[in-house]
Amino acid sequence: MTRNRRLPSYPPRQLDINPGLLERVVAGIEDIRSGKMVIFVDDKDRENEGDLCLAADHISADAINFMATHGRGRISVTLTEAQVERLELPMMQLPDRQGPTLGTAFTVSIEAREGVTTGISASDRAHTIRVAASTRAKPEDLVVPGHVLPLKARRGGVLVRAGQTEGSVDLARLAGLNPAGVICEIMNEDGTMARLADLEQFAERHALKIMTVADLIRYRLQTEILVRRIESASVVLGRTGKPWTVHLYEDSIDSLQSLALVFGDSLQKEATLCRMHVGSTLGDVFTALSGDGRRNLHEAIDAIEVEGRGVIVYLPSQGDLLSELQAAKGGVRDPGMTGKSTTGPLREYGLGAQVLRDLGIRSLRLLTNNPMRLAGIEGYGLEILEFVPLVSARMTS
């Protein structure tokens, strides 16, 4: 790798935030601050569901009763990673079992040790939530199991994982309250999940505001950036001997490093050909896993060189070498689906999206054999105009 002082520069670009979006988010935060609930909606290509959301600081028996009566879903308290660690709550997942598809991080169920009767009443559950969310709470203040299910929010919030768990904690923090929330899925009277049209009627009926994960992402991106570029160099990739520019990024959450491999220039002018690739030492270097990681990576390099310009964002592995060995032993196809996250790279793409934003990219053509729309992608100021299959997929079809 050779240092090059004339490397292309891609200054970070601010997202254009329209007044309507700003007004919606600020109004929602103000409602959370004042003790009101909001309806928090995720992306239509994720669950396309809405949760009643309230700051844990404002929980009450009346609020629990409203959620149980009108929301009808599961009532959970959302806690930061630090609070879950403080309370010494183990995750509700067996080491040899795959976790929930969307990476929902349940801990074991809890109950307040004192101040409750059976634990299931609205007042009992409100009390348990107050105890669990308190900054003064200790492990001995709770018993296990109980009638309240805590959810652990990822550090970095919706900028790292675009879910209602993280969003509820973010909203409480942005409102100047203790970063803990209470959420409850909204169901229709017939037991089906309420979708956007149902949620709009629900909001009008109960005079509640609707917020979306994508809106909150856009709002946070105006003031918070989780990645920074720390080094750049010129390298030769592929088999053509052509120079690429490699930028090294580091995130501010846990100092994980990622790479942006850039070929060509004028990335901002038209839709840029991009590949988001989750790294795997065994798969990419030694081809030891049953997935197509190494082949896909090489095909992406070739495709971008033929195109004349493009970017590969190489993200750190979701797990560690032990996880990769277990994946090889168990025949797990995608190494990105193992280890610390069972949701795969397309579920928690926030850091990679921020890298693309830093390069000035707004619209992209995504190189992938899994043509699904990323949840909340518009919240990062990015738009996928086309899914481009890799060569091996085109040959197979």
PLM region spans:
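Catalytic domains of riboflavin
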Residues: 1-397
